[in-house]
Amino acid sequence: MDPETCPCPTGGSCTCSDKCKCKGCKCTNCKKSCCSCCPAGCEKCAKDCVCKGEEGAKAEKCSCCQ
């Protein structure tokens, strides 16, 4: 399975767990893990935020809070 995709539907469940790198993850069971790189106080993190795992200085940039 491509680590950049997530097979589950909106609100579904999947095996992302703590290693979620899905760009469009909408799984309720791994949303918090997807947003672990968000800064404190980012209200969007609990909604549709997904971390973009890159290397170096751009590592763990958050799609909703950069």
Swiss-Prot record:
Residues the record lists as binding a divalent metal cation 1: 6, 8, 22, 25
Q: Which PROSITE patterns match?
A: METALLOTHIONEIN_VRT (PS00203)
Q: Which residues carry this modification: Phosphoserine?
A: 33
Q: Which residues bind a divalent metal cation 2?
A: 8, 14, 16, 27
Instruction: Locate the transmembrane regions by residue number.
Output: none
Cite the binding residues for a divalent metal cation 4: 34-35, 45, 49
For a divalent metal cation 6, which residues are the binding ones?
38, 42, 45, 65
Q: Which Pfam families match?
A: Metallothio (PF00131)
GO cellular component labels: astrocyte end-foot; astrocyte projection; axon; cytoplasm; dendritic spine; extracellular space; inclusion body; microtubule
Expression across tissues is: Brain.
Q: Which residues bind a divalent metal cation 7?
A: 51, 62, 64-65
Signal sequence coordinates: none
Region listing for Alpha, in residue ranges? 31-66
Q: What does this protein do?
A: Binds heavy metals. Contains three zinc and three copper atoms per polypeptide chain and only a negligible amount of cadmium. Inhibits survival and neurite formation of cortical neurons in vitro.
Family, according to the entry, reads as follows:
Belongs to the metallothionein superfamily. Type 1 family.
Q: What is this protein called?
A: Metallothionein-3
* Species of the source: Rattus norvegicus (Rat)
This chain is encoded by the gene named Mt3
